Amino acid sequence: MRKLIFLLFCVYLVSCSPSNNAILYESVAIPEAGWTIDNPVRFTVEIVDTTQPYDIYITVRHNTDYEWMNLFLFMKTYYPDLEFSRDTLECFLADETGRWFGRGSSSVRDHVMLLQRNVRFPQKGRYQFEFVHGMRTENLRNIMDLGMKIVPSR
């Protein structure tokens, strides 16, 4: 009986998780050979409610052999009417002493960073987000995954 109660409690916790109401929660694996500038990472989401505000997060997973304390990303947002906007993001992964931010153990670190809060998408339809790294190397090594999460604002 205790096992059943524990199992039901776990199911309840998972169902209350903020990830369950995400309209986008996706991660793309970066090849072990590295992330080249000509290989953008793309995420697509369908927006049906333009009155709902959303919070947008970027997730980064890297190993501790990553050479820099930050990660620059160039982001293009394609709107349903095929217009687009550009933005440059700087993700801080470590402090100036080299101590990694984020969570993880051993040689892998996970970062969840708020990109924008209370965003209202101006048009209904399909949006595409495209990311290219903006680091000073053609082939960026030791970034393992790049992800995006869009959830209704609370």
Residue positions per predicted region:
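C-terminal motif of bacterial Sec signal peptides marking the signal peptidase cleavage site
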Residues: 12-15
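Bacterial signal peptide processing site
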Residues: 17-20
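Post-signal peptide N-terminal segment of mature Sec-exported envelope proteins
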Residues: 23-46
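A beta-strand/beta-hairpin structural motif
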Residues: 42, 91-93, 101-115, 131
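Noncatalytic modules at the cell exterior or secretory-pathway interfaces
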Residues: 50-58, 119-135
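Short acidic/polar inter-strand loop motif in beta-rich domains
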Residues: 62-65, 109-112, 118-120, 133-143
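Exposed low-complexity, polar/acidic, P/S/T/G-rich flexible segments that act as propeptides
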Residues: 73-78, 136-154
